[in-house]
Amino acid sequence: MNRITSLLGTQYPIIQGGMVWCSGWRLASAVSNAGGLGLIGAGSMHPDTLREHIRKCNAATKFPFGVNIPLMYPQIEEIMNIVVEEGVKIVFTSAGNPKTWTGWLKERGITVVHVVSSSRFAMKCEEAGVDAVVAEGFEAGGHNGREETTTFCLIPAVREATTLPLIAAGGIGTGEGILAAMVLGAEGVQIGTRFALTEESSASPVFKEYCLSLGEGDTKLLLKKLAPTRLVKNAFREAVEKAEDSGATSEELRTLLGRGRAKKGIFEGDLEEGELEIGQVSAIISRRQSVAEVMNELVESYRQAVEKKYLFER
């Protein structure tokens, strides 16, 4: 047991990322049942849909689970009230100022974890009173920080800057990766891509199969004038790159992006015109597995990595 498992009430310090269009109740409950912490991704749900997923997750697992809430959510007050009404005990927040909601949530007995992309924001989280931070590096899928700091560099920087329990994210998908994060100063890991491609993920099977075929360099961080987003190669990404190369304004990029592209790509499986989001670690994932298989593999490969001798001294 360490500070993360103690805080979250889990067997393992492994958290499933609350990804849009992937992280419904089936995925979250499966991860929690396997010893990790499952997160429902509120970012792609209407309030009533979120309530339904929370109730179904409660029925599917007796273990802790949480909800990931982007603070930029337009119906944020309604979402927060639903979380309280439905008895959710753990909330991960992102994409906003942690001071806005942390106190309100903690007054209602909820554990609060905030996602950051820099040591500067980690210190702000400590000032805000969060219970732990997720430090997410450049390798992660979806929306990224503007700093473009890799996980390998970010974790020790955040560890030095704050005493908060630290969860590493971005580019982690193996037991060896978990061990590396721990050595760098993390006490837990948040894994998105590996779980997004499992059987229980609500993402389109077409999207999953395409992502399982990706190699190094097939994702790229774009849309930096809006919100930096790691996108998979397809016709839409080519259009974004062309627009950015020609000096498109923020407004022109918003028009190109339109509405519903992430749903079209990730949930509906439109591989050409959809916004396909996945992390760099997809390059080393080639099989679709169940959550139980992934968790068993992560834990076993972590244990094997710990037992190896890495000494270079004679």
Residue map of PLM features:
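Conserved acidic functional residues
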Residues: 115, 170-171
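Conserved active-site-proximal phosphate/metal-binding subdomains
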Residues: 145-167, 173-314
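Active-site entrance/lid segments in N-terminal catalytic domains of soluble metabolic enzymes
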Residues: 1-161, 165
